[in-house]
Curated annotation (Swiss-Prot):
This is CRISPR system endoribonuclease Csm6. The N-terminal CRISPR-associated Rossman fold (CARF) probably binds the cOA effector. ssRNase activity resides in the C-terminal HEPN domain. GO terms for molecular function: endonuclease activity. NCBIfam families: cas_csm6. CDD domains: Csm6_III-A (cd09699). It comes from Mycobacterium tuberculosis (strain ATCC 25618 / H37Rv). The keyword Nuclease applies. CRISPR (clustered regularly interspaced short palindromic repeat) is an adaptive immune system that provides protection against mobile genetic elements (viruses, transposable elements and conjugative plasmids). CRISPR clusters contain spacers, sequences complementary to antecedent mobile elements, and target invading nucleic acids. CRISPR clusters are transcribed and processed into CRISPR RNA (crRNA). Encoded in a type III-A CRISPR locus. It comes from the Bacteria. Disruption phenotype: Deletion of the entire CRISPR-Cas locus (cas6 to cas2, Rv2824c to Rv2816c) decreases resistance to plasmids encoding spacer elements about 6-fold.
Amino acid sequence: MILFSPIGTADPITALGDGPMLHIVRHYRPIVVVLFLSAEIAAFENADRRYSAAITRLAPETDVRIVTYTNPSVHRFDLFVPVFRNHLVELSAEFPDRTILLNTSSGTPAMQAALVAINVFGIPRTTAVQVSTPARALSKPGDRESPDAYDLELMWDANDDNQPGAPNRCFEATSAALGALLERANLKQLIVSYDYSAAVTIAADSRLPDQVSNLIRGAMHRSRLEHLVAPKFFKDTAFTYDPANKVAEYISALALLAKREQWAEFARSATPAITIVLRAAVAKHLPEDRYLDDMGRVDRRKLEREPEIRCALKHPPKSPNAEWYLYTKDWLALLRQFAPDRVGALEVLGRFESRVRNTAAHEIVSISEDRITKDGGLLPEQLLKILARETGADLTLYDRLNDEIIRQIDMAPLG
């Protein structure tokens, strides 16, 4: 037998036992193992040979071959199909009488989806092998060692799969199950891409448990800031949803636009976020009822009794009867007057907002991350960190949510 295996963060051994690749080697004893490594994973192999050394430790006679994939787009399903197929066709020609095993439990969701698709179409003929987790339940982040401080000797000695009688967690996917596997691999790819709307459509027909489907649907509603609908999907989960803290939810959703690289929408959506943060900063030092009405507009009658505030707000509307709303420059002026120690930390927000807003509103150009950084003077990541610091927003929310959704998809029965 020949094993073709992408490598992921559960390989070669976790705190609970064999990772998928090593478990297949343990129970199938292939004569050749081809490890397909992304650039990030290859760096770990180059540093300590953790993947090849684990195979050699278990099965010294195995021929271990390494393929390094340097393209950073490790979440592009369409890129992997021809790459994998070329390697598999070569293996089939080299070993015409051997069964080629595909590890469909390791690597990125896109890698898994590509291997399942190749197996379904049968060119070349392969056998898809799935491996359940050692706990046969949802894995947890703490189950995996940090890849940056990995001790193979320690993990080997603590590996319960080395014990006599340890169960075989491998199973070969049947033709009926392969369609479901491919569908779920595609679903995971949509989740990784933060395309929750498309994921909801696929999940509706994928025979997943309601718990998983509801979490995907909740992610969709939450990312849309649908505060009346979303909270019910996160009841009794680790992903606390407080509808009262709409500002933090907005910042988390803004971070999602950056992850999706929707830079034009990010530029437009940054303005309200910055305004909210500056207004909240002012409110900590200057009660709003001293100068604003219930609608958040400047109350001119109140302002007559507030010379300090009136002095700071130097740009009233030209018409004395016009509604008076405050903008970024006004909130910064109030900060200078009433909280000068806070201006230095927040003034960058004003510069970013005014410059990027002008680009988004007045120029017919493609807005890129580089353009936002050049015009705004801040990387989007830097802007988000400032906004999160001021609001308590969780910038990792949707990544953590994705991890949980994918874990539940992986553990859901195929029938």
